[in-house]
From Swiss-Prot:
Gene: guaAB
Protein name from the UniProt record: GMP synthase [glutamine-hydrolyzing] subunit B
EC number assigned by the record: 6.3.5.2
Pfam families listed in its UniProt record: GMP_synt_C (PF00958), NAD_synthase (PF02540)
PANTHER family cross-referenced by the UniProt entry: GMP SYNTHASE [GLUTAMINE-HYDROLYZING], GMP SYNTHASE-RELATED
Keywords: ATP-binding, GMP biosynthesis, Ligase, Nucleotide-binding, Purine biosynthesis
Amino acid sequence: MFDPASFVKEIGPQLKQKVGNERVLAAVSGGVDSTTAAVLAYNLLGNKVIPVLIDTGFLRKNEAEKIKAYLSNVLPNLIVVDERETFTSEIEGMEEAEAKRKKFRELFYSSISSLMRKFNAKYLMQGTIAADWVETQGGIKTQHNVLVQIGIDTEKEWGFTLIEPLADLYKNEVRELARYLKLPKEISERQPFPGPGLLVRTIGKLTREKLEVVREANDIVEKYLDPFNYSQYFAVSFESDGNFVILDGIDAFLYKARATGVKGDVRAYGNIAKVECSDINAAKSFVDTLVKYDITHVLCSLDERSNGKYSIAIRAVITEDFMTADYARIPKEVLEKISSEILQKIPNVKEVLYDVTSKPPATIEFE
C-alpha cells in the first residue's frame, strides 16, 4: 500500500542531492500530477523552484485565473506565461491526432527552454506518472511530457535536465500524495486534464471556431457532471459529416473524423460511429459488435437539430488507474439537460452524443 509520508521521506534527500544549489523550473498545468510534483519540490527546495503555467490557448474556460487562485497558498510564486497565439497559430489547420500532439510537444518544450534560460534554471520538474509513459512506450498515443522513457535526450535537445519524482506512481497514489501535501481539494480531487488540453478534444483539423465550441461545451458538461464525481468527464467537438452504413445488421453513421483507440495493447486510429440507442445502459452488445470493425468510439445520439456543422460528444468514465475504464451511466434526465443547454447556447452545433465505449477498445481521450 502506498504511504505518502514514506514517499516524501525517501524522495526528499534524493531531490536535494540532485539539485544542489541549482534552480528548478516546475511546469504546472493545473492538473493534479504536475501541481503535486511542483508543490512537493517547492516544499522540499523552497525558492529554488520556479513554478510556471504556460497558457497555450488550449486551457478550459477561465482556467489560468482559477488555477492561480487555487494555488495562491501552496505555490505563491506561480508565474502564468501567455503563449496562446503562438500555439494556436502554429497548430491551426493540422488534422492528424499524433501530428498535433507531437507539434504541441515541440512548441511546449521550445517555450520551456526559453523560460529555463530566462530564469537560469538547470532542471525541469514534470508531473509525468506511470500511465503516461506506459501509453507512449506502447505506441498508443504520444504524451507530450514523456521524453526520457522514449529515448529523447533533453540535455541535447533543449539544454535542460529532467526531474520526474512521480514517474512510478499511478493516479490514485498521486491523489493520496496531493492530500498529504495539503493541496486544495479543487486540485487534489479534480479530474485529469491532458497536457495538450482542448487541442486533443478538438477532433480532426484544428480551427479557432471549433476550439471555442468545445471550450463552451466542456464548460457546460463539467457544470452538470461535477456533482457525480466521475473519474473523468468532458466534451469533444468534430465535424458532423459522414455516411450511413449497416454493419452486422446494425444501422450506424460513420463520421469522417477519426479517433484513437487501443486494440490488442496497440494503438488504433479508427472511425467514430453513431447509433440510435434508447438505453445507454444496454450499449455493450452493439459496441462489442461495432468495434470489431475499424471503429474506436461508439456514440449514442442524444439530441439534434437540422442546422449546424459540429457534433459534440460527451465522455464520462469510471476508473481506478486510468489504464482501463468503463463509461459512466449518467441519468437520462441529466444527459437531456446537458444536450438542451449545448444546443441552446452554442451556435453551429448540430447534435449532441454520448460515448458508450469502454477503455479498451477506446482510449479515454479521443486523440
